[in-house]
Design a protein with these regions (language model features):
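Alpha-helical transmembrane segments and their helix-helix packing motifs
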Residues: 2-177
């Protein structure tokens, strides 16, 4: 269900306080565009922008410009209705591509000193946090899964967990080896 996205990000209480219905429209709005949700994409982009603004003296100058452009793009796209089903995939693909561009830019231009170390620690902590959330979600689905539903359900669930964490390619390469 769509609500699993809210649960995955520990936003159940915040969601329930603002929305009565657990449907696609509300979940997408809450997770991407709700400026009162501290974990929404829009709030996260604004926080990254603010963090870069306050650390401009130690971060590459263009990183600030790139995140500023991405934040402006996201806000304008949301105003223009990009959360609708027909436009959402293209919008999220653009956001993902811009995030990867920013990550790559910082990784290739930041001096490898204590600032680099802190940036790497933050990236690794965020990755570990998201990985444990995805694993928790997969484990929960398996624990509540009725064995009579489908014999291959565990394989499908773990395949989805691997894809969600971007680990499916590495898994296939190692299993095939």
């Amino acid at each position: 269900s769509w609500f699993n996205l809210v649960t995955l990000n520990s936003g159940d209480a915040e969601y329930e306080a603002r929305y009565k219905v657990r449907d696609e429209r509300n979940v997408v709005k809450f997770t991407l565009a709700d400026d009162t949700n501290s974990g929404s994409m829009l709030v996260s982009l604004s926080m990254v922008r603010e963090n870069l603004r306050t650390t401009r003296d130690v971060m590459p100058e263009s990183a600030w410009e790139l995140i500023n452009e991405l934040t402006t793009f996201a806000k304008q796209s949301i105003k223009d209705g990009c959360l609708n089903r027909g436009k959402r995939h293209e919008f999220l693909t653009q956001v993902t591509n811009q995030c990867q561009l920013i990550q790559g830019y910082i990784a290739s231009t930041l001096s490898h000193d204590e600032v680099w170390d802190m940036w790497c620690i933050g990236r690794h902590l965020e990755c570990a946090d998201m990985t444990t959330r995805i694993l928790d979600a997969g484990t929960h689905v398996l624990a509540t899964h009725d064995d009579r539903d489908e014999a291959h359900a565990p394989l499908i669930i773990w395949g989805n967990v691997l894809r969600s964490s971007g680990a499916d390619h590495a898994y296939r390469r190692n299993v095939a080896a």
